[in-house]
Each structure stands twice: as C-alpha cells, then as structure tokens.
C-alpha cells in the first residue's frame, strides 16, 4: 500500500466484519450480516469498490458475482493509521504525541513502568 487512505465509519464496519470472518465473502453475505442497516446492493458495492480503490480489499471476479478478501491485515491497517496520525499531527515525533497525550495529567505508576519496559525492549531490538 503506497499511500494511506482513512476509512469512513461504514467502510470500517465492513472491514471489521471481513477481517473477523477471515474468509473471502460475497456482497450477498455482507448484506445479510448488515441487514439491520438496510443497505441496498448498490450501496454495499460502492463501499466495496472504495475499499478496493484504497487497496484494503482484493476482488476476485467470479461468474456468479465478486468475492472480496482483505488485502491487508487489521493489525497492519492500525499500524498505518497510527503512523499517519503521528506523521500528520506530530511530524513523526513519538515524544510529541506522548506529550500531547499526557497533557499535564497524572500517569499511573504501573502504566509508566509498563511503558518504560516497552521502551527498553524496543531499544534492545535496534
């Protein structure tokens, strides 16, 4: 995936289901899962086309309809989204992000210790 494309809320709902199913799906299956949303087939097809255009799903064309499968894992998407946030709002600075997150509030001692251990582990991997 060359460029990061953020998903709309509806696209994210659909992707979560596709990731959770962990098997290729059809429009009909997705419409059944989202029957409470009362989306028409064209609406679902539009969402799936957008997800494909963003490089998030792969489409396999079959005679009885397309089959859709994730092109990236959920974990990879979250990594890309986090990196995009870091780059766009904090110039890629993790320290800037953590400072904004902390914002003068109190940090739980246990959480601070877990973060310290995590940073030590990350440092060892380099």
Feature locations, PLM:
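Short alpha-helical segments that sit at the start of domains
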Residues: 1-17, 125-126
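Short, cationic-aromatic polyanion-contact patches
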Residues: 4-10, 62-81
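Short helix-capping/hinge SLiMs at alpha-helix to coil transitions
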Residues: 19-23
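Short helix-coil junctions and helix-kink-helix linkers
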Residues: 32-41
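Short, hydrophobic-biased segments on the C-terminal half of alpha helices
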Residues: 45-49
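Amphipathic alpha-helical dimerization/coiled-coil segments
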Residues: 80-123
